[in-house]
């Protein structure tokens, strides 16, 4: 795989093998790729490993197809079924969001946890509920800034919001990282007054229908060992259209086929770092490593879809 930095900002992850029938694996909105920074970026490494599994699967499939001798893959020529990014927040699990998140039995400030941040960003999208546990969620104040509130009232309100969600989803707090079980998020959604459907191994069509109806999706991926994982928000969609040229040297037969790539916009909950459009097939469980050479985040993909306030 190659990583391409763009002069205007942002970068792309692309396949280096023409047998992979997907010219783009990921399009990141902002920033640039720096190997010295990225080698410690678990989010990028998570996706890169999944993308490598997808590439191996595609190569195996290509070698078994149709008897064609050569193949040419175009770049993405257009997009269709585009749903622009729904959420406008770029939150992270540090200050001020974790101001009231404490390590049990201590006064040490903990990380807020990815589940609370992802859930909180969806609550902020709907500006609901108005209050809980005696805390007023001043949504206009909370949303006064993209990365964090610009007012003290907003910072206090969002810190209460994230702390309340953390208690409801039973977040286990730690100084360097915090975590919870994916199914615990149901507690926060139920208590805070939300409808939802919980699905394992969701299809890209389900994601598309949700964002088309202006419903962001909570999605999570867990490593096989179940010791690490991540929850984030999918809040946009686009089908990238490209073309494949086939040619058979023996028969002279050629064919040109239109293909589409389901690209989902991911808000990772890291202050905007890595946000962008990612090939959803990479998250699909059928593209787990066919050679079983190593463990990756290739199990326990699940999502909360059809999220909306009950009001």
Indicate residue ranges for each PLM-predicted region.
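Noncatalytic regulatory segments and standalone regulatory/sensor domains
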Residues: 1-3, 11-80, 247-253, 259-261, ...
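Solvent-exposed loop/turn segments at secondary-structure junctions
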Residues: 9-10, 20, 109, 120-121, ...
